[in-house]
Swiss-Prot record:
SMART domains for the chain: Elp3 (SM00729)
Region listing for Disordered, in residue ranges: 597-662
Keywords: 4Fe-4S, Iron, Iron-sulfur, Metal-binding, S-adenosyl-L-methionine
Cofactor(s), by name: [4Fe-4S] cluster
Name of protein: UPF0313 protein CPR_1216
Positions of the Radical SAM core domain: 296-567
Residues bound to [4Fe-4S] cluster: 310, 314, 317
GO molecular function, one term: 4 iron, 4 sulfur cluster binding
Biased composition (Basic residues): 633-644
HAMAP family linked: UPF0313
Co-factor note (free text): Binds 1 [4Fe-4S] cluster. The cluster is coordinated with 3 cysteines and an exchangeable S-adenosyl-L-methionine.
Gene3D superfamilies in UniProt: tm_1862 like domain (3.80.30.20)
Basic and acidic residues compositional bias, start-end: 618-632
Source lineage: Bacteria, Bacillati, Bacillota, Clostridia, Eubacteriales
Length: 662
């Protein structure tokens, strides 16, 4: 592929195309990857398809204005995003330590983007071109459009539209609204006065300027000074986050009014097909070849996006505030055509890594009502259980998988983007389940039960543990019948709001009973735009306004994390202290149900734990043996949990990186 098939990144590229000036210059905190898994690629190609000239400035040096001028002043304006991931999450771990690698940067090098990139870039653009139109979007802008709690500053920050000084904010996936914005700019409108488009935010000087039906939220001053008010404000945002029934929201910021128009409708199937058929080069720009490319492309190069939106609505997930709860999907033909294209890549080895989306086995709205009435205001589709009106049907997805796996040159089609096992179990037809196990598991199936404590699962918005048990038993039954050795990898989370030390110990006991120790544990990470983050900050559940326990101290968070890896000798002292603190000395000693040995009982060469660390035996034990292990519960655990089994029937020690939780 020749370099000039990418959009211009320098003046020479513009000259080669015969351009004197760009209509738009898109500034991004990621390296330039022209693949539809990256927002920069989609927005730039959608605008190109609408007839606009778009140039790209990727990862500019923000310490001067020079890089921001290298394509000249755009005719209509600058578009700015902070990359595919919020820059603060990209830079820092949950313990606020600097990460070692940036997968969206050449060589994985850190320091090529600033903290709060959207704000920094907008300031530099204003320095270079004072009165140019600036439109911000992407995940950073979308999830920070309201006044929001910021974990890294540990305070409530203003809307990013205020802090950045941009003229307009587009939120969500934004294909529809960005073209409409472009058309108005092209007609001569000032960006500040484009005010009626769904999925956009603007700043008004007074309430008299707002003509749409709207709700006035508590002001920035009010939510930043009172946590109960913050929680009440978030509840309104949460309820109105719907493109059908949602209303415009207004929030005062120091005498100005941030106006958040209702969300844009999700793209139809035909619209999605057109977006994904645009002439993406499906790789990084050739300028990165000398540095070995960009690692982020490896996760998506041989994967196919099937759908958008998620009906799961997990409390800790930001999908609700970005893509929304209404699921839409590409047509089978669109996906099959792209799969055929992938088979022609020189480095394709016959394996499609994924056909999915936020949740792989969602292909349509949860029920027929959603497209006309919107998602229910006071109910979740799948929590605490699956709604009776939810249409559970895997037939279309199954037919798609069959078509792709039959294509010449394709050896295997895997599913890696996450499956809702409760949705699978609710399907009365188990054909999909059988074919999933037979054809679409790469040795390990990743699912996200997250926890076992009923109390924690309630706050997470996750299904009851018994549903996972049923799924797990059926998975291993089918696996055994097929004569395969396949495992389940559970995503587990520590320190989620509502998780007390006894809840973490309950999870540790389950891990003990199945002889499984995760290599990695995810601490809850309070990121903007989620229900769980609001719980973390306010210590209230916004949906009920009841108090929520928050494991906030470093000591307790370390204890909860260590309990999930109690077999690790390095964690012995922390686990010991946690058990003593919780009054669970019954789990310290030499008994079969003890998590760790007593400090006085170590013999030469003995592990601090009473249990083997797993290893090959733990990975390869058959499911029948696992079933018997699940029945061996301590009397204390039974008393806590009642008769409901919420165990994890696991066979693998490895935990994969970088996948979204479902």
């Amino acid at each position: 592929m020749s370099e000039n098939k990418f959009l211009p990144i320098c003046k020479d590229d513009m000259i080669e195309r015969g351009w004197e000036q760009c209509d738009f210059v898109l500034v991004t905190a990621d390296a330039y990857i022209d693949h539809h898994s990256f927002g920069t690629a989609i927005i730039s190609r959608v605008l190109e398809n609408a007839g606009y000239k778009v140039g790209i400035i990727a990862q500019p040096d923000w310490k001067s204005v020079d890089d921001f001028k290298k394509l000249g002043r755009p005719r209509l304006g600058f578009l700015v995003n902070g990359g595919n991931m919020d820059p603060m999450v990209n830079h820092y771990t949950v313990s606020k330590k600097l990460r070692k690698k940036d997968l969206y940067t050449p060589k994985g090098e850190m320091g090529k983007r600033p903290d709060r990139a959207t704000i920094v870039y907008c300031n530099k653009i204003r320095e270079a071109y004072k009165d140019v139109n600036i439109v911000i979007g992407g995940i950073e802008a979308s999830l920070r459009r309201f006044a929001h709690y910021d974990y890294w500053d540990n305070k409530v920050r203003k809307s990013i539209l205020v802090d950045s000084g941009a003229d307009l904010l587009v939120y969500g996936m934004s294909e529809k609204q960005i073209v409409e914005v472009a058309d108005f700019l092209n007609q001569g409108f000032d960006g500040k006065y484009i005010r009626h488009i769904p999925g956009t935010c603007y700043i008004a000087d007074s309430l008299d300027e707002i003509y749409e039906e709207h709700i006035v939220l508590p002001s920035f001053k009010d939510v930043s000074s009172d946590k109960r008010t913050y929680a009440e404000c978030f509840k309104i945002q949460y309820d109105e986050q719907d493109p059908v029934r949602g209303r415009t929201l207004v929030q005062e910021h120091n005498g100005k009014y941030v106006v958040i128009n209702k969300p844009e409708m999700p793209l139809s199937r035909e619209e999605l097909d057109r977006v994904y058929a645009l002439p993406y080069q499906k790789t990084y720009h050739p300028i990165y070849e000398k540095d070995g490319g960009i690692a982020a492309i490896e996760e998506v190069k041989f994967s196919l996006v099937s759908s958008r939106g998620c009906s799961g609505n997990c409390s800790f997930c930001a999908i609700t505030f970005h893509q929304g709860r209404i699921v839409t999907s590409r047509s089978e033909d669109s996906i099959v055509e792209e799969a055929e294209e992938i088979t022609k890549y020189d480095d394709f080895k016959g394996y499609i890594h994924d056909i999915g989306g936020p949740t792989a086995n969602f292909r349509k709205p949860a029920c027929k009502k959603q497209l006309t009435l919107g998602a229910c205001k006071h109910k979740r589709c799948m929590s605490p259980g699956i709604c009776k009106n939810m249409e559970v049907d895997h037939r279309e997805y199954l037919h798609l998988l069959r078509r792709v796996r039959k294509l010449p040159g394709i050896k295997k089609v895997f599913i890696r983007s996450g499956l809702r096992y409760d949705y699978i179990m609710a399907d009365k037809d188990d054909t999909f389940f059988k074919e999933l196990v037979e054809h679409h598991v790469s040795g390990q199936l990743k699912v996200a039960p997250e926890h076992v404590s009923p109390n924690v699962l309630k706050y997470m918005g996750k299904p009851a543990g018994k549903t996972y048990d049923e799924f797990r038993r059926k998975f291993f039954k089918i696996t055994e019948r097929l004569g395969k050795k396949q495992f389940i990898i559970p995503y587990l989370m520590s320190s989620h709001p509502g998780c007390k030390l006894e809840d973490a110990i309950m999870l540790a006991e389950y891990l003990r009973d199945i002889n499984y120790q995760p290599e990695q544990v995810q601490d809850f990470y309070p990121t903007p735009g989620t229900l769980s983050t609001t719980m973390f900050y306010t210590e209230l559940d916004p949906l009920t306004m009841e108090e929520v326990y928050i494991p906030r101290s470093k000591e307790e968070k370390a204890m909860q994390r260590a309990l999930l890896q109690f077999k690790n000798p390095k964690n012995y002292n922390i686990v010991y202290d946690a058990l003593v603190k919780a009054g669970r000395e019954d789990l310290i000693g030499n008994g079969p149900k003890c998590l760790i040995r007593d400090k006085n009982s170590f013999g030469k060469g003995n592990n601090h734990s009473n249990h083997k660390s797993g290893g090959r035996k733990s990975r390869n034990e058959n499911s029948g043996r696992r079933e018997s292990e699940d029945k061996k519960r301590s009397s204390h655990s039974k008393k806590q949990r009642g008769n409901k089994s919420r165990g994890f029937d696991q066979k693998s020690q490895r935990v994969s990186k970088g996948k979204k939780r479902r």
